[in-house]
């Protein structure tokens, strides 16, 4: 059997996927966690409840009877103290299924799942054999990390740089809510920005390799207060994020060396942001379905761990 189940229960989405290692194809199913209009997200207790409701529904629509193993994200990052209760839902389900079906369970982080999903989507999974840089840009992280092959973890993750305050996904959602969009706001903010004909350039606020994004929130609020059209505010926000990521990329490459770079995470589903980074040498981007939270990466993680064993 060459089928591997992946699970991911983040603070945004309930996700499951089945990866067929024999032909490198994937079938995924996922569902956003419901958020009340006007709210900025879910408390962890509410996220755990929603995952408990949604995960059986998600799994019932996937062919999991012949799987050889399970991959699951159990924490946000592979770092000491990294913890979020919502990941217990996926971890518990994976443990029960693994025991019932007598198949192994391999545990990893949400971040590694994002990176592997992006590499798979970009047809760059071969990169895991050598060092490369990865950006994980989402509601919880704006990180650049060095990824190196590791016998035990598959990928050894070393932080290179990050946002010191607001994360890019938080900025997107906060600006979207200012403009009356529903949370999470990424897709609608991009649609709004596409209507703008203006060009925006932003000088990033940097502290060595790290960035600061909180000033952007204030700029967007001021623009709204001054009567700037919503489409221009949206584009202002997204162009600024892309300028920040480009500067982080330049500084990380200067520090670490000329390595391949993959851009992962929900914010990187935005085509306006991708467009500004397309000229980065040796870069790779995931398709939107593999940028947003998903379980494809954890399914592939299980397959790779199985092959290694």
Which residues fall in each region the model found?
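A short helix-loop
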Residues: 2, 9-10, 19, 27-28, ...
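Short beta-strand-loop/turn "lid" adjacent to the catalytic site in phosphate-handling enzymes
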Residues: 60-95, 99
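Glycine-rich beta-strand-to-loop/alpha-helix junction loops that act as flexible
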Residues: 72-75, 138, 262-270
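N-terminal phosphate-binding loop and adjacent alpha-helix
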Residues: 33-63
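Glycine-rich phosphate-binding/hydrolytic loop that grips phosphoryl groups
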Residues: 114-118, 286-309
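Phosphate/pyrophosphate-binding loops at sites that engage ATP/ADP/AMP, CoA/4′-phosphopantetheine
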Residues: 56-69, 249-259
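Conserved phosphate-binding catalytic cores of ATP/NTP-utilizing and phosphoryl-transfer enzymes
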Residues: 1-2, 103, 107-133, 300-304
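A contiguous, well-structured pocket-lining segment that forms one wall/lid of small-molecule binding clefts
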Residues: 187-261, 267-284, 303-309
């Amino acid at each position: 059997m060459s089928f591997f189940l992946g699970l991911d229960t983040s603070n945004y989405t309930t996700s499951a996927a089945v990866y067929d290692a024999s032909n490198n194809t994937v079938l995924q199913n996922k569902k956003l966690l419901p958020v009340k209009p006007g709210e900025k997200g879910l408390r962890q207790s509410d996220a755990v409840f929603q995952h408990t409701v949604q995960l059986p529904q998600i799994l019932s629509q996937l062919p999991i009877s012949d799987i050889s193993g399970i991959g699951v994200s159990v924490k946000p990052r592979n770092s000491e103290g990294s913890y979020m209760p919502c990941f217990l839902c996926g971890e518990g389900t994976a443990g029960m299924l693994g025991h019932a079906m007598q198949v192994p369970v391999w545990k990893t982080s949400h971040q590694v799942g994002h990176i592997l999903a992006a590499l798979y989507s970009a047809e760059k999974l071969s990169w895991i054999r050598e060092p490369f840089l990865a950006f994980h840009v989402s509601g919880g992280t704006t990180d650049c990390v060095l990824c190196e092959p590791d016998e035990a973890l598959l990928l050894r993750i070393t932080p290179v740089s990050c946002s010191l305050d607001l994360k890019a996904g938080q900025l997107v959602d906060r600006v979207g809510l200012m403009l009356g969009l529903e949370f999470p706001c990424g897709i609608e903010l991009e649609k709004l920005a596409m209507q703008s004909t203006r060009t925006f350039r932003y000088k990033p606020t940097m502290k060595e390799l790290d960035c600061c994004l909180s000033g952007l929130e204030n700029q967007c609020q001021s623009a709204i207060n001054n009567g700037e059209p919503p489409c221009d505010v949206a584009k202002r926000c997204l162009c600024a994020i892309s300028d920040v990521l480009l500067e982080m990329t330049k500084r990380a490459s200067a520090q670490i060396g000329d390595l391949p770079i993959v851009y992962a995470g929900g914010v990187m589903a935005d085509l306006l942001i991708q467009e500004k980074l397309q000229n980065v040498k040796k870069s790779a981007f995931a398709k939107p379905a593999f940028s947003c939270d998903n379980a494809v990466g954890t399914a592939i993680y299980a397959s790779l761990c199985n092959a290694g064993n």
